UniProtKB/Swiss-Prot annotation:
SUPFAM superfamilies membership: Metallo-hydrolase/oxidoreductase
Record's keyword annotation contains Transport: yes
Protein name from the UniProt record: Coenzyme PQQ synthesis protein B
Alphabetical GO biological process terms: pyrroloquinoline quinone biosynthetic process
Keywords on record: PQQ biosynthesis, Transport
Pathway note: Cofactor biosynthesis; pyrroloquinoline quinone biosynthesis
């Protein structure tokens, strides 16, 4: 069976953000049940070996909160985490790697462009490549990630290009991996080889193209970019100066938003993740939450598990 754990569902900074008093963050400060850590997933085909989709800055907290990711009883050093698949080079996708520097073996899988970012930042050298190899992945070429002992994982992963943008901290600077936008933002199709069940993960997506609709149609499970409800919400709320589009994220709502664009595709379960603190849909009793739930979408809490 294919198992998915939502380790965190929030966008960069989490909810509440450390210095924010917006309505969503204030509500989460008053009621910790509303809090969410930064977006990351754990995927397994055997319930024993797990692969992370992105390593959020909150990863240590997420591991502590997730028994499936704890060291084996009686082992001095052990982790069931077999690898990390990176979908982009943003801070909230790679910073958690620094919390995995204690010498347990696992592999990092990423596009060459993201691996170039890691090479260009010497702080990531705390991950000894003889123990934590960095394995390039190519788009539209299925691969089976390996367990630390070289055994096959039982998962098949296909990365594909998604409309998006490069890491914000590289804006206006030379990209270590070159100027091409190829590899900046990846989606993933993950399949359990024994059952054929599959899911799609898109932690960032700037727009839904016809090709993307065709790829996602009929999927049993979709985990999709839910950063903002409205494209201009950070600006209108006084929280920022960029639109969702400028950050590489499609809005949930609107004629060109994700809810409308992905309707009527026969998708089974639809979960939003990477949800920004500015997004009113995080509030359980908001009109926005009601609209997305009516359209068949869910806002997962940290720790939500789905089995296919």
């Amino acid at each position: 069976m294919l198992r998915v754990i939502v380790l965190g569902a929030a966008a960069g900074g989490g909810v509440p953000q450390w210095n924010c008093g917006c309505p969503v963050c204030r509500a989460a400060l008053d009621d910790p049940r509303l809090a969410r850590t930064q977006a990351s997933l754990a995927i397994s085909a055997d319930n024993a070996h797990w692969f992370l989709i992105n390593a959020s800055p909150d990863l240590r907290q997420q591991i502590v909160a997730t028994p499936q990711l704890h060291p084996r009883a009686g082992a001095l050093r052990h982790s069931p985490i077999a690898g990390v698949i990176l979908t982009n080079g943003e801070v909230d996708a790679v910073a958690g790697l620094l919390s995995m520097r204690e010498g347990s073996p696992f592999s990092i899988y990423a596009h060459d462009k993201v691996l170039a970012i890691l090479r260009a930042n010497s702080i990531f050298n705390v991950l000894n490549e003889s123990i934590v190899p960095r394995r390039p992945i190519a788009t539209d070429q299925p691969f089976e990630p390996l367990l630390p002992d070289g055994a096959l994982s039982g998962l098949q992963i296909t990365a594909f290009e998604v409309p998006g943008k490069g890491a914000w901290y590289l804006e206006g600077r030379a990209h270590p991996g070159g100027d091409s936008q190829s590899g900046d933002t990846l989606g993933l199709t993950i399949t359990d080889k024994s059952t054929g069940q599959s899911l799609h993960v898109l932690t960032a997506c700037a727009r839904v193209t016809d090709d993307l609709k065709a790829r996602l149609a009929g999927a049993p499970l979709l985990l999709f970019d839910g950063t903002v409800w409205r494209d201009d919400e950070l600006i209108t709320a006084g929280l920022g100066t960029k639109t969702g589009q400028a950050m590489g994220h499609i809005a949930m709502a609107g004629d060109d938003g994700a809810i409308a664009a992905l309707a009527d595709l026969g998708i089974g379960q639809k979960l939003f993740l990477h949800i920004n603190n500015s997004n009113p849909a995080l509030l359980a009793h908001s009109a926005e939450r009601g609209q997305l739930e009516t359209a068949g979408w869910q806002i997962p809490a940290d720790g939500t598990e789905v089995t296919l």
